């Protein structure tokens, strides 16, 4: 849960500093069976060193569920839970790409979506500030 708190605090920081330009992006898996639309600010990403994030090489941003829309592939998703079973890691059954996950924000009331920014179309990762998170020690 500390990871989600860190991610949400990063979003609050963006709002406080007035740098919260929202834009819609399309994303999905490699084979195209899972596709979604997200609305977010691409200023910051989180690189976590926990076991699953290190193995899959994700760069993450967390958004409220209201800013996420699954366009197709709901039946193509496999859910993977581990450790405390708080975050649903969804991956495509066909190509294996994990392009997003869902979990409950700290406080237990709002669902947030973790977007793997590497799965979004038309973005330049070189323009994004990457913030390190020590999930390995949690």
Q: What kind of region is each of these model predictions?
A:
Residues 13-28, 33-138:
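A short Gly-Trp-Pro
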